[in-house]
């Protein structure tokens, strides 16, 4: 059960999103789990402005999981060039081929099955589950930690087990279970555009 402060937070965030959030990115509103996954992997350790360019290149060349899975390693690594952290690219290919071989190129629609895929952690699994399948899993990244810590006055270190539990519990309480995709995108955008790190 949400407290009145928690209810107010969720309501105001969704209100801000509806009236003022004009942040545009090519993957916003997309329901294709492949494209959501691709965007999330590209954005790990990469700024959004740079990531957009790579996302467009990848989605134009490899339109679905099977086309990526069938590509030659050398070709994919060449396209990835400049993004660094090549382990991300290696995991991308491994997972694409696993899904091609074991699931006819389809993403699982279950959060826990998504989480089992190589290179996919809790954050990316929640993003895919909520954006593609509208499942009620809160995304929790640096933006979300910062917003919740500031608004709710949480001082528990986020890199501690206690902190992770506290923030995860709160994030899932705040999540609008009827509109998880809308809520998750809203809180990420609010953290990126309004509640910035050095304010």
Residue locations for each model-derived region?
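Catalytic cores of DNA base-excision repair glycosylases
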Residues: 2-7, 12-199
């Amino acid at each position: 059960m949400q407290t009145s402060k928690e209810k107010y937070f969720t309501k105001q965030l969704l209100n801000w999103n509806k009236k003022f959030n004009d942040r545009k990115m090519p993957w916003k509103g997309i329901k294709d789990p492949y494209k959501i996954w691709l965007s999330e992997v590209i954005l790990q350790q990469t700024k959004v402005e740079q990531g957009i360019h790579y996302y467009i290149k990848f989605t134009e060349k490899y339109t679905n999981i099977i086309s990526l899975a069938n590509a030659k390693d050398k070709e994919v690594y060449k396209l990835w060039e400049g993004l660094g952290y090549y382990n991300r690219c290696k995991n991308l290919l491994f997972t694409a081929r696993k899904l091609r071989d074991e699931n006819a190129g389809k993403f699982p629609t279950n959060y826990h099955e998504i989480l089992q895929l190589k290179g996919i952690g809790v954050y990316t699994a929640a993003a895919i589950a909520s954006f593609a399948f509208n499942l009620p899993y809160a995304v929790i990244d640096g933006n979300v930690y910062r917003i919740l810590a500031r608004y709710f006055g949480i001082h528990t270190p986020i890199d501690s087990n206690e902190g992770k539990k506290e923030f995860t519990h709160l994030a899932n309480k705040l999540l609008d279970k009827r509109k998880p995709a809308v809520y998750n995108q809203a809180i990420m955008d609010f953290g990126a555009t309004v509640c910035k790190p050095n304010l």
